Amino acid sequence: MEAVVFVFSLLDCCALIFLSVYFIITLSDLECDYINARSCCSKLNKWVIPELIGHTIVTVLLLMSLHWFIFLLNLPVATWNIYRYIMVPSGNMGVFDPTEIHNRGQLKSHMKEAMIKLGFHLLCFFMYLYSMILALIND
């Protein structure tokens, strides 16, 4: 059972890594004016809920399988994703709003957040890979 948890976590982490890279590429395209703010934000807002669900499922799965250290490592990022989604003002298009993305350095903060998430998911990828190999050897 432990190996199945880490295989699923590893696959989910791969998807989240690709999603983080997609966020970085799309935000850098907006920064360089290759795409407009409306199309950038609509592309990114499509993937906010799948990212939220994917990370939350892995976090809950780690809690249920009693992997406390990895659960506690994932908990702040999952909490931040939920908080960011809940705190979207009612008039905004989503987490990424085209009317406000160039205001108050939001583009830079979104880019920094995407980079931090990419580093976090890469760290988790190798942790899950190590744990999966260890679980397969012990079975």
Curated annotation (Swiss-Prot):
The record's listing under SMART domains reads: Cornichon
Q: Which residues form a coiled coil?
A: none
Transmembrane stretches, start-end: 5-25, 57-77, 118-138
Membrane-related topology note: Multi-pass membrane protein
Q: Which GO terms describe its biological process?
A: endoplasmic reticulum to Golgi vesicle-mediated transport; protein transport
Chief location bin: membrane
The record's annotation in Pfam families points to: Cornichon
Listed GO cellular component terms?
COPII-coated ER to Golgi transport vesicle; endoplasmic reticulum; endoplasmic reticulum membrane; endoplasmic reticulum-Golgi intermediate compartment
**Keywords, ordered alphabetically:** Endoplasmic reticulum, ER-Golgi transport, Membrane, Protein transport, Transmembrane, Transmembrane helix, Transport
What superkingdom does the record give? Eukaryota
Gene Ontology molecular function terms on file? CCR5 chemokine receptor binding; signaling receptor binding
Q: Where in the cell is it found?
A: Membrane; Endoplasmic reticulum; Endoplasmic reticulum-Golgi intermediate compartment
By its UniProt entry, which InterPro entries does this protein fall under? Cornichon (IPR003377)
Give the UniProt family note: Belongs to the cornichon family.
Function, as annotated: Involved in G protein-coupled receptors (GPCRs) trafficking from the endoplasmic reticulum to the cell surface; it promotes the exit of GPCRs from the early secretory pathway, likely through interaction with the COPII machinery.
Oligomeric and partner information: Interacts with Sec23/24 complex components SEC24B and SEC24D. Interacts with CCR5. Interacts with ADRB2 in the early secretory pathway.
The protein's name is Protein cornichon homolog 4
Per the UniProt record, the source organism is Homo sapiens (Human)
**What's the name of its gene?**
CNIH4
